Regions:
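Cytosolic, long alpha-helical scaffolding segments
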Residues: 1-228
Length: 228
């Protein structure tokens, strides 16, 4: 069928119904499964847009798998355990993508990244190690939002009906993803500043050097905000 996109272009698709596309990813796990590798598989399946993730073991699930799943559901927005047995776990996406517009997510990421950079600089000037550690912790929230944008971008590529419901053409979704990736990198740099603030918390920096750093940071944040 042909679908008229919000930008006036035509999309040719074999599926024009309003129902969502359900995709399931199955992972076999065991005692020898690497923890870090499994977490990457879960995050990858989430970002790729799978609506359900099944973890299956030949015997009982190792305890570390259940713990890792709990950590993953706290990291990934909308993911919840909906089924669990001794040998399997089912994780399902319960978030309606249309309720999380790209623009709102990007704005939230901008505010977080901006606040992180401001607080990281304040931590350096004030020798505040606790504030610096808080900045580092906030980077996880920016990552969560970036993963959500990446997931929704992939979902729109896969599901034309979702593109219509959200009023976002495929090329615009890709643009939001690129912006999200840049903002996530800005937050990463703020995290590096915070790590340095922790290392320098017991050292005294010259007033002139601090003024130069504050001026550079303020200019960078001004450009950042204007670009948004």
């Amino acid at each position: 069928g042909l679908i008229v996109q919000p930008d006036g272009s035509l999309l040719i698709t074999p599926k024009i119904g309003g129902e969502s596309i359900h995709r399931v990813r199955v992972f076999e796990v065991g005692a020898s499964t690497d923890r870090t590798y499994l977490l990457r598989l879960l995050v990858g399946a989430y970002v790729a847009g799978f609506t359900a993730i099944h973890l299956e073991a030949k015997g009982r699930l190792p305890p570390f798998v259940r713990q890792l799943v709990r950590e993953f559901t706290q990291m990934a927005i909308g993911q919840e355990v909906v089924g669990e047995t001794d040998s399997s776990i089912v994780i399902k996406d319960l978030l309606n993508p249309a309720e999380m517009p790209f623009e709102n997510t990007i704005k939230r990421m901008h505010l977080l990244a901006r606040g992180m950079q401001q607080d990281a600089m304040a931590a350096i000037r004030g020798h505040d190690a606790a504030l610096a550690r808080d900045v580092v912790a906030r980077d996880t929230e920016v990552d969560r939002l970036h993963w959500l944008v990446a997931r929704q971008d992939n979902l729109i590529v896969i599901d034309a009906a979702l593109s219509r419901r959200m009023g976002i053409p495929v090329n615009q979704a890709a643009y939001y993803f690129q912006v999200s990736r840049i903002v996530e990198r800005i937050a990463d740099h703020a995290t590096r500043v915070a790590h340095n603030a922790t290392a320098l918390s017991d050292r005294e920096a010259g007033a002139a050097m601090l003024d130069v750093m504050d001026e550079a940071s303020a200019l960078a944040l001004e450009i950042f905000s204007e670009s948004m």
